């Protein structure tokens, strides 16, 4: 057992390097810096190749784990072939490579990378080195990017940092810290014109704060939550088609939600639904030609295809089941917030925001290193 752990320790450094390369490149792809996108893509690929070596040389999995690895890996690889965009495949490899590492330490590591990069981006934006784009929509809505190429990035990134801080901290969190985070969230929301993200941040922070005083005794009764991602995906599709048929409720709701249903309907009409990724799908942040599908479930279905949507729904059902099995209320709340808000924002697959994705690697963890309670495939 000690020899096995020593062998793993020698490989852990490579995994941390892989995560660093992947996370930094992914972060920089969203920042207004004159960096060659092809270089960033190759950096992500390099990180993935380092992580891939852990799969090639790893033999300590049971047949079910090998089958699951092969099925998900091949499905995501084949799914990406029509577009040549292998980001989902890269993400899976990075997550898989974390299977025998301590998950809280990994999340803390990614949190540290993102926090430093966020502070550095803010500082460089104040100095004028990073461009602060101004977006004007419908001639009335003025939004600032604050150093990022899309105005919605920083608000949700700040939300994710706050949530992960409350999850990772071992000390009691005082209400004044929650209040300070909420004030900062509304300040960012005011500048970026994303009030909904500010309210979501406030609600999530208060829920996480309340976990210090709330204890769940009957966790088994929460198992139904693992089907919530599938329910929300089905509801999103149904709601869009009802809007396309002229349902008065969803037509009015479309105006309230800043035409989200309109863009989803355009996506279905212009690109349709395929089994695999659609090479013709393209978004635009240009105010004159703006097009984007914010609903993560619809976005996955149209841009990445039916196969990718099914795989991601399975991943999130597993993550919810994992939280319930481990009786981890904080992580469960964070994941459920991401799952519910996926009907409005596409953030389910952004590792530098959804650090909890590394927990999916528990499905492939070496049985000798497992706690019996953790072993979901026994």
Predicted segments, located by residue:
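Hydrophobic transmembrane helix bundles of membrane-integrated enzymes that assemble
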Residues: 2-29, 40-59, 64-248, 295-372
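Membrane-proximal cytoplasmic C-terminal regulatory module of class A 7TM GPCRs
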Residues: 372-378
């Amino acid at each position: 057992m000690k020899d096995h752990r020593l062998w793993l320790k020698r490989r852990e450094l490579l995994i941390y390097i892989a995560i660093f390369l992947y996370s930094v490149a992914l972060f920089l792809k969203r920042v207004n810096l004159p960096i060659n996108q092809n270089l960033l893509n190759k950096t992500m690929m390099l990180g993935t190749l380092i992580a891939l070596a852990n799969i090639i040389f790893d033999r300590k999995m049971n047949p079910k784990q090998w089958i699951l690895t092969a099925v998900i890996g091949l499905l995501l690889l084949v799914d990406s072939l029509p577009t040549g965009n292998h980001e989902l495949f890269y993400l899976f490899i990075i997550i898989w490579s974390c299977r025998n590492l301590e998950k809280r330490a990994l999340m803390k590591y990614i949190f540290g990378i993102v926090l430093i990069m966020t502070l550095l981006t803010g500082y460089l934006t104040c100095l004028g080195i990073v461009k602060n784009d101004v977006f004007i929509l419908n001639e009335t809505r003025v939004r600032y990017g604050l150093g990022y190429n899309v105005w919605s990035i920083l608000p949700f990134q700040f939300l994710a940092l706050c949530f992960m801080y409350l999850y990772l901290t071992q000390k009691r969190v005082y209400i004044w810290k929650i209040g300070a985070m909420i004030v900062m969230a509304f300040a960012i929301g005011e500048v970026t014109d994303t009030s909904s993200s500010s309210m979501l941040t406030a609600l999530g922070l208060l829920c996480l704060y309340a976990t210090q005083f709330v204890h769940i005794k009957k966790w088994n009764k929460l198992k139904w939550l693992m089907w919530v991602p599938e329910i929300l995906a089905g509801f999103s599709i149904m709601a869009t088609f009802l809007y396309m048929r002229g349902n008065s409720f969803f037509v009015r709701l479309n105006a309230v939600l800043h035409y989200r249903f309109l863009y989803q309907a355009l996506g279905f009409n212009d690109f349709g639904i395929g089994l695999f990724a659609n090479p013709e799908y393209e978004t635009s942040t240009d105010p004159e030609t703006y097009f984007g599908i914010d609903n993560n479930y619809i976005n996955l279905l149209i841009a990445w295809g039916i196969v990718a949507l099914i795989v991601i729904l399975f991943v999130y059902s597993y993550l919810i089941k994992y939280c319930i099995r481990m009786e981890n209320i904080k992580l469960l709340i964070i994941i459920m917030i991401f799952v519910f808000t996926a009907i409005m924002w596409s953030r389910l697959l952004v590792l530098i925001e959804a650090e909890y994705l590394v927990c999916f690697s528990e499905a492939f963890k070496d049985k000798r290193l497992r706690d019996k309670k953790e072993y979901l495939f026994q």
